[in-house]
Amino acid sequence: MAMQFYTSPEQIMRDRSEYARKNISRGRNTVVLSYAGGVLFVAENISTTLHKISELYDRIGFAAVGRYNEFENLRTAGVRMADTRGYAYDRRDVKARPLAQAYAQTLGAIFTEQTKPFEVEICVAGVGSSPDDDELYRLTYDGSINDEPGYLVMGGQADKLTSVLKEGHNFDLDLTGAFRLALKALSSIGGENGKDRTVGAELLEVAVLDREREGRVFRRILGPALDALMPESSGDAETPDTGGSGQHSDEPSKPDAEGGEKEQP
């Protein structure tokens, strides 16, 4: 009779956590932060069609890192849940927190019940009437949910990027200042010998939840509008600029048509 090997529940959970963290850390980072005019999303993404940032509902955005097919399924489920609630009750009843809680329950169930956990980390962000009313929720592979006031970072070496944001963030930043702070954080890792690197516009996916708009407020920043936000030289990225305003695309995104990038090492 063959001997049955025993693995403790604690060891199983540790192995699953290590597996998920290792694969998430290989991906490119995403930064989300509140600023005077709304909520800004900045992600490293070489794809122009597979999105890591998207809209969930009128005033709610979604960002993710990790395995594309997994967080895309989560995004689609969130859009359906928000649409159903808005149709059954009122569009104003659709808030970021219930969506984040639903994601937490789903991720937690998958982590404990399935053989393989989801290799994802996601953000659900809701824009309020003022920066103090913004909601930023970060959800991890095991269903943990954290309320992150002001800013958050997802992906590998998040601690270092968070320290950069902590030093420079304040709610009075305009769009240009907020973008350059996010760019400074993203540029602070990945260079040779631990130095900063240059991150070009072609490597970025950028969007905002515009506080001043009515209805659907999610807008992507593309082409010339994104180029206008970029610093003229790499040195300009060291200090956020609070003097510019930036522009954004007037075309609303379509929640049912957006996806994300499969993370690359």
From Swiss-Prot:
In residue numbers, the region (Disordered) covers 228-265
What modulates its activity?
A: The formation of the proteasomal ATPase ARC-20S proteasome complex, likely via the docking of the C-termini of ARC into the intersubunit pockets in the alpha-rings, may trigger opening of the gate for substrate entry. Interconversion between the open-gate and close-gate conformations leads to a dynamic regulation of the 20S proteasome proteolysis activity.
* Keyword Oxidoreductase belongs to the record: no
Checking InterPro entries in the record gives:
Ntn_hydrolases_N, Proteasome_alpha, Proteasome_alpha-type, Proteasome_asu_bac, Proteasome_sua/b
The entry's localization annotation reads: Cytoplasm
* Chief place where the protein resides: cytoplasm
Protein's GO biological process = modification-dependent protein catabolic process; proteasomal protein catabolic process
Question: Disulfide connectivity?
Answer: none
- Cite the SUPFAM superfamilies for this sequence: N-terminal nucleophile aminohydrolases (Ntn hydrolases)
Pathway assignment reads: Protein degradation; proteasomal Pup-dependent pathway
Provide the alphabetized UniProt keywords: Cytoplasm, Proteasome
Instruction: One Pfam family, please name it.
Output: Proteasome
Q: Where are the transmembrane segments?
A: none
Composition-biased stretches (Basic and acidic residues): 248-265
A single Gene Ontology MF term assigned here is: threonine-type endopeptidase activity
Q: Does the keyword Cytoplasm apply?
A: yes
Note the superkingdom of the native organism. Bacteria
The entry's cellular-component GO terms read: cytoplasm; proteasome core complex, alpha-subunit complex
Tell me its family: Belongs to the peptidase T1A family.
Instruction: Report the function annotation for this chain.
Output: Component of the proteasome core, a large protease complex with broad specificity involved in protein degradation.
Subunit relationships? The 20S proteasome core is composed of 14 alpha and 14 beta subunits that assemble into four stacked heptameric rings, resulting in a barrel-shaped structure. The two inner rings, each composed of seven catalytic beta subunits, are sandwiched by two outer rings, each composed of seven alpha subunits. The catalytic chamber with the active sites is on the inside of the barrel. Has a gated structure, the ends of the cylinder being occluded by the N-termini of the alpha-subunits. Is capped by the proteasome-associated ATPase, ARC.
The name on file for this protein is Proteasome subunit alpha
What species is this protein from?
Answer: Stackebrandtia nassauensis (strain DSM 44728 / CIP 108903 / NRRL B-16338 / NBRC 102104 / LLR-40K-21)
